[in-house]
């Protein structure tokens, strides 16, 4: 027990030595950007967060975005990377605290001459602690912390990218649906024009050139419709991939463009907008991680100080302690 007391006193006396840190100081560089947008902000707030796509007031779009965020494989991978980084940060934190190990040993002997036997039970407790003299352990902890924060921004960037792609494919499907509907109506008109032109040609009212031109216009519209139909199929496949599947129906896919409200865009100064991007935040955090890695490597050449202590007892001593705890 005296060893443990001395160890605790030593830990308190040497904890202040961590002030000898050799960590680098990070300074965010100043950006040469315009102080404000050239256009008027019209009094809108400089921060816009949350489910901003709901500003379009389209329930089908809202359901589709939520389905993509729940089922997309990239979101799951980014989530797993974040969990792994958080576990790494928790593990790095344990390097700054004492490590404790306990053992329980038992042994027995028997005298072959007189048949007497004896047994011993020996529990032991060991403590070890590395004093972070130069900030090496703190640098390792900072690395894990920066990586965890960067992984969180990676998840946010993946989420933002998927939302953008979902909206893009959604409106592409809507536009192509409207274009196909309009093209089908135009094709029907061109077919009627061709029939009328053919009748006039057979009656001698128009030349063969007029008939050929009418037929070419119909054929051109048919080719255009075929291209639009193929593009719509490709947009549907892209949306299925966002949903994490390669086939099946798209219940919330639009058939035509619907004119609805367009949400206002919150405007701020360019530097603020740039700093809010998750990919920019992740890059800055990983830069700080790199600086911490350099600190760890540099301080790794310095001497280290480790404190250890232990306590053990045998079965006889343990029995006495249990019988007389005041001793």
Residue ranges and their predicted role:
Residues 2-70, 145, 229-275:
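Terminal intrinsically disordered/low-complexity segments used for targeting and assembly
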Residues 46, 69-71, 143, 206, ...:
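Amphipathic alpha-helical coiled-coil scaffold segments and their short linker/junction regions
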Residues 53, 62-65, 79, 89, ...:
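Extracytoplasmic/secreted envelope proteins and their assembly/folding machinery
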Residues 96-118, 128-157, 176-179, 281, ...:
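Small/polar (Gly/Ser/Thr/Ala-rich) solvent-exposed segments
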Residues 121-127, 269:
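Hydrophobic, lipid-facing positions within transmembrane beta-strands of outer-membrane proteins
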Residues 137, 153-269:
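Periplasmic alpha-helical coiled-coil/stalk elements that build and connect Gram-negative outer-membrane
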């Amino acid at each position: 027990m005296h060893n443990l007391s001395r160890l605790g006193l030593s830990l308190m006396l040497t904890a202040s030595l961590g002030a000898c840190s050799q960590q680098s100081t990070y300074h965010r560089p100043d950006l040469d950007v315009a102080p404000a947008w050239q256009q008027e902000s019209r009094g809108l707030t400089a921060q816009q967060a949350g489910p901003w796509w709901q500003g379009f007031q389209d329930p089908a779009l809202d359901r589709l975005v939520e389905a993509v965020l729940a089922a997309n494989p990239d979101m799951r991978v980014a989530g797993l990377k974040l969990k792994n980084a958080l576990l790494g940060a928790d593990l790095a934190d344990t390097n700054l605290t004492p490590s404790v190990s306990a053992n329980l040993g038992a042994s027995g002997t028997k005298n072959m001459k007189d048949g007497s036997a004896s047994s011993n039970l020996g529990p032991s407790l060991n403590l070890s602690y590395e004093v972070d003299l130069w900030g090496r352990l703190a640098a390792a902890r900072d690395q894990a912390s920066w990586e965890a924060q960067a992984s969180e921004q990676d998840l946010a960037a993946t989420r933002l990218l998927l939302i953008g792609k979902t909206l893009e494919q959604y409106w592409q499907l809507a536009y192509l649906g409207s274009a196909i509907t309009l093209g089908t109506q135009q094709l029907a008109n061109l077919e009627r024009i061709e029939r009328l032109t053919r009748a006039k040609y057979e009656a001698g009212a128009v030349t063969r050139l007029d008939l050929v031109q009418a037929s070419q216009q119909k054929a051109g519209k048919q080719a255009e419709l075929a291209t639009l139909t193929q593009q719509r199929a490709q947009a549907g496949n892209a949306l299925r991939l966002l949903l994490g599947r390669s086939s099946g129906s798209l219940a919330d896919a639009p058939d035509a463009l619907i004119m609805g409200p367009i949400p206002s865009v919150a405007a701020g100064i360019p530097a603020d907008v740039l700093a809010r991007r998750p990919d920019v935040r992740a890059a800055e955090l990983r830069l700080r991680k790199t600086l911490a890695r350099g600190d760890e490597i540099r301080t790794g050449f310095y001497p280290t100080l480790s404190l250890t202590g232990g306590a053990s007892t045998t079965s006889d001593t343990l029995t006495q302690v249990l019988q007389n705890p005041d001793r």
